[in-house]
Amino acid sequence: MERIEQVVHDCDAPHASARVARDTAARYLSAMKVKDADILIVPGYTNSGPEHWQTRWQSKLSTARRVEQAEWSKPVREDWTTSVANAVNEAERPVVIVAHSLGVAAAVQAIPQFRKPVAGAFFVAPPDVANPEIRPRHLMTFGPYAREPLPFPSIVIASRNDPFCAFEVAEDIAAAWGSLFIDAGETGHLNEEAGFGPWPEGSMTFAKFLTDLKA
């Protein structure tokens, strides 16, 4: 099935609109194919459920695996970053990180511990861990974010009505990291509760992102 696993299995949507996304994405021929990378799925606070887009992608991408955390509901920064770093350092191929929410914070804070190459990172809905109003409050222990370019290509996708991060804050974070910033419109936290099980636009964007990475 290659071709970015048939563009994340026909853009991960059973509806006609997904056919359009698939046809657009399928035009891209990959410089980096799924088989060339270890794709690390890094969920956020409380993990990603069975219908979450991360879980769906994991089931459809042959080299994808989840970074598991010992405690999903009471995250400890050191534990989470160590889990991410261990997954990167145990990889046999260049790594592509696919992180959502607090998983973005964990991945970014783990960078100093990386000993293996990371080809790129696909970051969705990063939380504002510097905001004292964030709940639960212990999520602030994952901040502050480094304000310097990341050592690998990255995309940040953010919503205009994310309850965990103001749009302008996400845009500023992406600029500091040197990330390509994508405005997802009013899409909540881009999670299961916001309707993002099937996510054809995300699948298409991820497929294009992989084509732009070096194998």
What residue spans do the PLM features occupy?
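Active-site catalytic motif of lipid deacylating hydrolases and related acyltransferases
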Residues: 33-93
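Active-site nucleophile loop of the alpha/beta-hydrolase fold
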Residues: 69-70, 122-130
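Gly/Ala-rich beta-loop-alpha elbow adjacent to hydrolase catalytic centers
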Residues: 98-103, 107
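Conserved hydrolase catalytic core segment
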Residues: 109-119
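Short beta-strand/loop motif that positions the catalytic acidic residue
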Residues: 156-158
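Acidic catalytic loop of the alpha/beta-hydrolase fold
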Residues: 161-165
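Catalytic histidine neighborhood in serine/cysteine hydrolases
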Residues: 176-191
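Post-His helix in hydrolase/transferase enzymes
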Residues: 193-205
